[in-house]
Amino acid sequence: METRLRILLIEDGLPKPEVQMPLQDETGSLIARPDLCYPEERIVVEYDGATHRESVAADNRRQNRLIDAGYRVLRFTAGDLLHRPSSVSALVRRALSA
């Protein structure tokens, strides 16, 4: 579904996002390799699939580190992609324009 999200954004005229780009904090430590990223704008786009409780906790810690490093994190689900695709691309577009 990450690929589907990327294709949706590109087909809606948004710039091509980086895929699984390693992001580091100010000390050079790896924070995350998000699904999609616009590094210059410090925008991270994540697809949330079916997860277990342990991975939710890890995702939350990673999101907190990204926010602490100055990234804006947008999260989407399969329902968003399948039922509200225009809302997904509109939100990413607004974030890129901010």
Segments from the language model and where they lie:
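Surface segments flanking catalytic/ligand-binding clefts of nucleic-acid enzymes
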Residues: 1-98
